[in-house]
């Protein structure tokens, strides 16, 4: 493509990868050859994540562009080659990925991604040192989108679906999310909702927490995961189905 989708001069840490991927512009053969010995151009974690997303897309018949994978731009063509075959450009990833990860509100990006991005891959960033806990990078990669830190919101439109064996890559599905609404306990300013979630990957079992502000005695919050949600400190629970998450349905908690 032209403009900022055209190949730019990369930094030296990307040269080997892009040299191997350059052939995609004229045919997939040279790209495939470059990926055969994947250790030369991509990490095992990247390969593992790409293969998992590819299998998921095949199993669920996810069409393109709903199958588009947003990742670090230097690996973006690898993911999309495996997953959907649309690997000619990394321009969109280069424009949006870092801005998204280092913003403080993942769900504000949902409208941008809704018809453009199906999956987001996060990665370990040890070389950057301290990363604010409020960033999307930390919320997704370290906490699977859960509001486990009381003053930092979780996410309602990014569902954790996979973690690699070493935990270096996490995969999130962009979803409409289900909205839970209902009456709040008396004299409560915020309601805490919790569901137990398990995804493929070692140790990938976690409590998915969302917090909702109470207005006029009621609360409303969007959740990215299906499951049984425990409401506040009492015995109240609500079931959120897979369909509700995928279709953006509202689930009402009875009073």
Model-derived regions, located:
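Extracytoplasmic
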Residues: 3-255
């Amino acid at each position: 493509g032209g403009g900022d989708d055209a190949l730019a001069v990369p930094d030296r840490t990307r040269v080997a990868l892009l040299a191997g991927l350059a052939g995609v512009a004229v045919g997939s053969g040279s790209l495939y050859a470059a990926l055969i010995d994947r250790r030369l151009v991509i990490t095992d974690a990247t390969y593992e994540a790409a293969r998992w997303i590819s299998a998921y897309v095949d199993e669920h018949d996810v069409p393109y562009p709903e199958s588009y994978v947003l990742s670090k731009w230097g690996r973006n063509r690898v993911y999309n080659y495996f997953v959907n075959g649309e690997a000619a450009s990394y321009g969109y990833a280069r424009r949006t990925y870092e801005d998204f990860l280092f913003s403080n509100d993942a769900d504000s990006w949902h409208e941008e991604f809704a018809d453009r991005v199906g999956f987001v891959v996060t990665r370990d960033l040890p070389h950057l040192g301290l990363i604010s806990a409020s960033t999307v990078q930390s919320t997704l990669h370290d906490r699977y989108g859960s509001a486990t830190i009381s003053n930092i919101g979780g996410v309602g439109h990014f569902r954790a679906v996979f973690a690699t064996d070493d935990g270096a890559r996490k995969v999130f599905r962009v979803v409409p999310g289900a909205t839970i609404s209902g009456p709040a306990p008396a004299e409560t300013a915020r309601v805490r909702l919790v569901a137990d979630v398990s995804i493929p990957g070692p140790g990938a079992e976690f409590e998915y927490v969302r917090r909702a502000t109470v207005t006029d005695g009621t609360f409303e919050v969007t959740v990215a995961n299906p499951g049984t949600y425990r409401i506040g400190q009492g015995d109240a629970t609500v079931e959120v189905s897979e369909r509700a998450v995928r279709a953006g349905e509202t689930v009402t908690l009875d009073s």
